[in-house]
């Protein structure tokens, strides 16, 4: 009896394996959304799977399989943050897989297993002194006043 119960538990845990995902917004590192999603077709790219996840959860977004423009209206048309002397920051949604940012668009990335972790982060790129100095740095480190209340 114990042996068959153990085997059933192992079989259920393997069949329930799914990628984990989270969406981290503008103001702090706590996820706005998180969960898991079983990938049954590994020929679908990560962009297609992102769209499926967002639609399944009813997450309001604008975008397509190669980019996400807005999640819950952020950044909307407020993606440009001017600074002194012509410097500026641009806000946008960036993705990570297993803690690293792949060097290509999301529609060119394919998950390899249901052990992967997908993370969407509202990030920024910084144009400073005539060159790009940062890319996809989490915006919660800035806490943009357009989206975040002061602490």
Language-model segments: residues:
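Sec-dependent N-terminal signal peptides
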Residues: 4-14
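Ubiquitin-like/PB1-type beta-grasp interaction modules and other compact soluble beta-rich domains
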Residues: 16-151
């Amino acid at each position: 009896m114990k042996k068959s119960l153990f085997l059933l538990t192992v079989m259920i845990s393997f069949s329930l394996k799914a990628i984990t995902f989270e969406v981290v917004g503008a103001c702090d590192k706590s996820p706005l959304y998180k969960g898991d999603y079983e990938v049954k077709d590994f020929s679908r790219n990560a962009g297609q799977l992102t769209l499926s996840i967002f639609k399944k959860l009813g997450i309001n977004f604008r975008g397509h399989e190669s980019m996400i423009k807005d999640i819950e209206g952020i950044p909307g048309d407020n993606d440009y943050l001017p600074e002194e002397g012509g410097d500026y920051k641009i806000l946008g949604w960036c993705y990570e897989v297993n803690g690293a940012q792949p060097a290509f668009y999301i529609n060119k990335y394919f998950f390899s297993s249901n052990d992967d972790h997908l993370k969407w982060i509202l990030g920024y790129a910084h144009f400073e002194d005539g060159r790009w100095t940062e890319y996809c740095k989490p915006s919660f480190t800035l806490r943009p006043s357009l989206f975040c209340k002061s602490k």
